[in-house]
Regions:
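Terminal targeting signals and extreme-terminal segments of soluble enzymes
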Residues: 1-88, 94-102, 106-151
Length: 151
């Protein structure tokens, strides 16, 4: 059963856009970007997102005594990238009350705007004892108040 959401009731997501130029070492024998590189492009997007919205980068997690492993990753390939193509990576944080980080990604080819790939990832918080957190860590709640209430 679908929920009936009121228009405007969903908070706008935080987004960041970054780019990368495809290197020769990233293509396979078919001269297109090897499928595993798209996962790295997603990570490039998350890292750039963390620089734009400080406080949720990997080093921040470590400083607070947490890690945030990926527990789910979805990726759909739409069109190829080749050497020297510039990939535009849009990364969007999807706000959730659950103790996790949900990101969506869209990758376009700069030269023609073509959609290349899209996907999503889910990360959970794990404390220094190796336990998965059932509630958001305090630092993340503070980060959310800082950045998500500015929207």
């Amino acid at each position: 059963m679908k929920r009936n959401r009121k228009i405007g009731s969903v908070k706008p997501a935080l987004t960041n856009t970054t780019q990368t130029t495809v290197r020769f070492s990233e293509v396979d024998s078919m001269q297109v970007v090897w499928h595993g590189e798209y996962v790295r492009y997603f990570e490039d997007g998350r890292e750039a997102f963390g620089r734009k919205y400080p406080g949720i980068g990997y080093l921040d997690f470590y400083a607070y005594g947490y890690t945030a492993p990926i527990v789910d990753l979805q990726l759909q390939y739409v069109a190829p990238l080749t050497v020297n193509d510039v990939a535009i990576i849009e990364t969007r944080l999807i706000d959730t009350a659950a103790a996790k980080l949900c990101f969506e990604y869209i990758i376009h080819r700069e030269c023609d705007g073509a959609l290349v790939a899209r996907g999503s990832s889910v990360q959970v918080f794990v404390d220094s004892d190796g336990n998965m957190c059932l509630n958001n860590p305090t630092f993340f709640e503070e980060w959310k108040r800082r950045w998500l209430t500015k929207q």
